[in-house]
């Protein structure tokens, strides 16, 4: 199992392309923010796959970008698969699950903070 902090740190480093300043303020729709969010999301799906399958069965019209499914089952470097997913889709899939507030939101905030990324509203 890949640790959440490892995924978030790796995603942020790849997205930034070089070492960034100690703190960076970015728009919530910035692709670097989206990649950190998606890294946390993929890690959460891997850790709680049965919950996601149950949610999908109960909500068959909820669709996910195919890149997310590919990333979940590809245990190598998946970050390049997740680039280019529109910010509105990222927000929709991440906030659309019942455990967003209790599990995903705190993990995303922690990962962004650990990477020195702070967000501002669009």
Curated annotation (Swiss-Prot):
Pfam families: SRP1_TIP1. Belongs to the SRP1/TIP1 family. Seripauperin subfamily. Disulfide bonds: none annotated. It is a single-pass membrane protein. Its main location: membrane. InterPro entries: SRP1_TIP1 (IPR000992), Yeast_SRP1/TIP1_CWP (IPR050788). GO terms for cellular component: cytoplasm; fungal-type cell wall; fungal-type vacuole; membrane. The chain crosses the membrane at residues 7-24. One of its GO terms (molecular function) is structural constituent of cell wall. This is Seripauperin-5. It comes from Saccharomyces cerevisiae (strain ATCC 204508 / S288c).
């Amino acid at each position: 199992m890949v640790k959440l902090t490892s995924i978030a740190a790796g995603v942020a480093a790849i997205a930034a392309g070089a070492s960034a300043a100690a703190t960076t303020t970015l728009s919530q729709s910035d692709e670097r923010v989206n990649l950190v969010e998606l890294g946390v999301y993929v890690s959460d799906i891997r850790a709680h796959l049965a919950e996601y399958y149950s949610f999908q069965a109960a909500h068959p019209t909820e669709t996910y970008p195919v890149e997310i499914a590919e990333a979940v089952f590809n245990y190598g470097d998946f970050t390049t698969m997740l680039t280019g997913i529109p910010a509105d889709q990222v927000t929709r899939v991440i906030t659309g699950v019942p455990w967003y507030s209790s599990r995903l939101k705190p993990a995303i905030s922690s990962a962004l903070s650990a990477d020195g990324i702070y967000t501002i509203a669009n």
